[in-house]
């Protein structure tokens, strides 16, 4: 994974949310608040299932 954007599915409520691959802060699900991404100093640790990579326009 590089520093792109990913559509990640929340493991608790199945909400699909776009997350930056190198997030520097924790990213929570907008619906239920479950952590979807945790920063690691480089690429974020994506905790939900990656549905797809968002392509650049």
From Swiss-Prot:
Gene3D superfamilies in the cross-refs: Zn-binding ribosomal proteins
Cofactor, how bound (note): Binds 1 zinc ion per subunit.
Zinc finger (C4-type): 10-32
Domain of life of the source: Archaea
Keywords assigned: Metal-binding, Ribonucleoprotein, Ribosomal protein, Zinc, Zinc-finger
UniProt entry tagged with the keyword Ribosomal protein: yes
SUPFAM superfamilies listed in its UniProt record: Zn-binding ribosomal proteins
Family: Belongs to the eukaryotic ribosomal protein eS27 family.
Protein name: Small ribosomal subunit protein eS27
């Amino acid at each position: 994974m590089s520093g792109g954007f990913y559509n990640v599915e929340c493991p608790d409520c199945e909400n699909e949310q776009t997350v930056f691959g190198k997030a520097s802060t924790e990213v929570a699900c907008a619906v239920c608040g479950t952590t979807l991404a945790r920063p690691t100093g480089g690429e974020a640790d994506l905790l939900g299932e990656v549905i797809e990579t968002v392509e650049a326009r």
